[in-house]
């Protein structure tokens, strides 16, 4: 009886491990697609902002942009550009930028005049995806 339980637990653990590995590989693939937009002149902030989204969901990521710094925000979902809409808002909810007004551009460069905490909202482009991994990368110039 103990051997059956052990085998059942072992099989379940292996199955979960493969599932987790597959999801991690998908997410890493999307991050690699997104990373091509952080060219050599931009240094990554070291974070990979990622989540799984359904078409009716909005993800929120929080970060601080420091005054006097030029940033690049790259946003991807899937293996092609334009699948993720991102909006950057200040603490009052004022929209500082949205790529929706720029044909869902996969990245955008901007200079921050004064330090500000921001929320980056990400939603899938409903015309191209019903669900998917969303990845946002942030780089800055030194």
Regions found by a protein language model. Name each.
Residues 9-17:
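Bacterial N-terminal signal peptides
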Residues 1-6:
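Positively charged n-region of N-terminal signal peptides that target proteins for export
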Residues 8-10, 45, 57:
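Short, functionally important structural connectors and interaction interfaces within domains
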Residues 24-43:
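Short N-terminal segments immediately surrounding and downstream of signal-peptide cleavage
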């Amino acid at each position: 009886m103990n051997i059956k339980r052990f085998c059942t637990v072992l099989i379940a653990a292996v199955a979960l491990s493969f599932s987790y590995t597959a999801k991690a590989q998908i997410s890493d693939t999307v991050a690699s697609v997104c990373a091509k937009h952080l060219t050599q002149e931009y240094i990554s902030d070291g974070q990979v902002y990622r989540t799984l989204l359904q078409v009716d969901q909005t993800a929120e990521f929080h970060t601080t942009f420091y005054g006097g710094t030029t940033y690049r925000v790259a946003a991807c979902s899937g293996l092609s550009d334009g699948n993720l809409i991102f909006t950057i808002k200040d603490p009052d909810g004022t929209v500082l930028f949205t790529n929706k007004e720029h044909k869902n551009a996969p990245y955008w460069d901007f200079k921050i005049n004064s330090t500000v905490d921001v929320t980056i909202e990400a939603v899938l482009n409903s015309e191209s995806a019903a669900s998917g991994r969303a990845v946002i990368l942030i780089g800055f110039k030194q």
